[in-house]
Amino acid sequence: MASVPCSFKLSAHRRSSSKLDGNNKQCSSLVERLRDKTKSQVPKSITCINRLEISRIAPLHATMNSPKGFGPPPKKTKKSKKPKPGNQSDEDDDDEDEDDDDEEDERERGVIPEIVTNRMISRMGFTVGLPLFIGLLFFPFFYYLKVGLKVDVPTWVPFIVSFVFFGTALAGVSYGIVSSSWDPLREGSLLGWNEAKKNWPVFWQSFWNSSDKR
């Protein structure tokens, strides 16, 4: 008679343990499902945020990296890799990737900021437009002297005057570029003489470097 309640207790204990095991398995399966869902959703949001941040930061990085847009690019130090036998194709792929990265960096350095471009255009409008306008005004002036006032003006005088003013307008293109402030965060002076002294050697150096590469 004493063995019957013992067996009953053991069977009840086994049933309760089997129920606990089943509940634990269900909980673990739910946790794994939640983890899979979060893993599939979180990287997408992170990648979208990263893309937006990169698209916003790229033009600012190009501006602050090379605000002038001129001059030789800084030299880069390339890491030396030890050659390994049987990995020649991998090394070639790595070299091609490095070359592509270098080309992209050079393009970013060559970008002139929009603020600096607007300064150059406004300065060229003054240095080119003013002498060109004055040179064009001399044509009706000489015509009035000759026809209206009957003044005998030599033919070489209009040619010299037009040559001087048109040449000044042509030189104003270069002066408008050089006399502008190439720093996006700093406005230049009115005439831009100090900026021209600083920027002129850099302008010629970049010009000769580009001609040597060709």
From Swiss-Prot:
Topological domains annotated Lumenal, thylakoid: 146-152
Basic residues bias (residue ranges): 75-84
Subcellular location: Plastid, Chloroplast thylakoid membrane
One of the Pfam families matching this protein, by short name: DUF3464
Gene: PAM68
Cited PANTHER family: PROTEIN PAM68, CHLOROPLASTIC (PTHR34575:SF1)
Transit peptide: 1-35
Keywords: Chloroplast, Membrane, Photosynthesis, Photosystem II, Plastid, Thylakoid, Transit peptide, Transmembrane, Transmembrane helix
GO cellular component, one term: photosystem II
Function per UniProt: Involved in early steps in photosystem II (PSII) biogenesis and in maturation and stability of newly synthesized psbA protein.
Disruption phenotype: Strongly reduced growth. Pale-green cotyledons and leaves.
Segments on the Stromal side according to the record's topology features: 36-124, 174-214
Regions of compositional bias (Acidic residues) in chain numbering: 89-106
Topology of the protein relative to the lipid bilayer: Multi-pass membrane protein
Record-annotated membrane-spanning stretches: 125-145, 153-173
Protein known as: Protein PAM68, chloroplastic
Region described as Disordered: 1-26, 62-111
